[in-house]
Amino acid sequence: MFTLKKSLLLLFFLGTINLSLCEEERNAEEERRDNPDERDVEVEKRFLGGLIKIVPAMICAVTKKC
């Protein structure tokens, strides 16, 4: 029973370290992405994507030829 507890404790410890390293890596990626130019490009892509979906519906509504 003691060896089982010991191995479970070891697995928990290693898992905690792994999650900690992943979180640090994710934070580093977010810091690199905080460049204002990149954020503007992302916003522009989202805006144009939504606009492309809406334009055909607006044309149909205005011309009433769908």
Curated annotation (Swiss-Prot):
Assigned keywords, A-Z: Amphibian defense peptide, Antibiotic, Antimicrobial, Cleavage on pair of basic residues, Cytolysis, Disulfide bond, Hemolysis, Secreted, Signal
Broad class of the protein's primary localization: secreted
Entries under Pfam families matching the protein: Antimicrobial_1, FSAP_sig_propep
Cystines in this chain: C60-C66
Organism: Aquarana catesbeiana (American bullfrog)
Family that this chain belongs to: Belongs to the frog skin active peptide (FSAP) family. Brevinin subfamily.
Name of the protein in question: Ranalexin
A GO biological-process term: defense response to Gram-negative bacterium
Subcellular location: Secreted
Species lineage: Eukaryota, Metazoa, Chordata, Craniata, Vertebrata
Tissue specificity comment: Expressed by the skin dorsal glands.
One cellular-component annotation, GO: extracellular region
Protein's job: Potent microbicidal activity, active against S.aureus and E.coli. It also acts as a membrane-disruptive agent at higher concentrations.
Signal peptide (residue range): 1-20
Removed propeptide positions: 21-44
